[in-house]
């Protein structure tokens, strides 16, 4: 099939398609670089909460990863890891969240500048086991997590 551009042929759709393709191709390297950058999860505010929706048949795996997370935080030689552990609570809701179990991380106070990304903490603490642990962690999720940054409004105990 041969296309010609002329006043009657109207080649504007072709130029639009070409521009779209070039735009996608030119942005692909930038996206790949952004994805390759290490992930970190910081809580810049007073505290945070993370809602985790876990598959019913994967709760034991998730809880096993949480035990490894605690072990990794406690055995770290970095003082901020012990501070993180002191303010990090993991709750399990007795009610289902739809078809899934709900686990809630409550982080208060948040350690300013500390990385709360579980994959980074596990990789740091267990470099040879990290892939297997993190595969269990990833497979346990029914859907992504909801992350909420929090500012303390009032401490009712003080």
Where would I find each of the regions flagged by the language model?
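N-terminal secretory signal peptides
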Residues: 34-87, 91-93
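Divalent cation-coordinating acidic motifs and surrounding scaffolds
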Residues: 96
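Bacterial N-terminal signal peptides
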Residues: 12-27
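An amphipathic, aromatic/His-enriched active-site/gating alpha helix that lines ligand/cofactor pockets
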Residues: 34, 68-86, 99-100, 107-158
């Amino acid at each position: 099939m041969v296309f010609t551009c002329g006043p009657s042929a109207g080649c504007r759709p072709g130029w639009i398609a070409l521009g779209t393709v070039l735009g996608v191709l030119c942005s692909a390297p930038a996206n790949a670089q952004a994805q390759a950058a290490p992930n970190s999860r910081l809580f810049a505010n007073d505290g945070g909460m993370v809602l985790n929706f876990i598959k019913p048949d994967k709760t034991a795996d998730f809880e096993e990863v949480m035990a490894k997370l605690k072990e990794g935080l406690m055995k770290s030689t970095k003082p901020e890891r012990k501070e993180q552990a002191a303010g990090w609570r993991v709750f399990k809701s007795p009610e289902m969240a739809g078809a899934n179990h709900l686990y809630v991380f409550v982080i208060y106070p948040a350690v300013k500048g500390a990385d709360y990304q579980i994959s980074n903490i596990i990789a740091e603490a267990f470099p040879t086991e990290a892939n297997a642990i993190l595969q269990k962690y990833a497979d346990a999720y029914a859907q992504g997590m909801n992350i909420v940054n929090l500012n303390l409004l009032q401490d009712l105990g003080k």
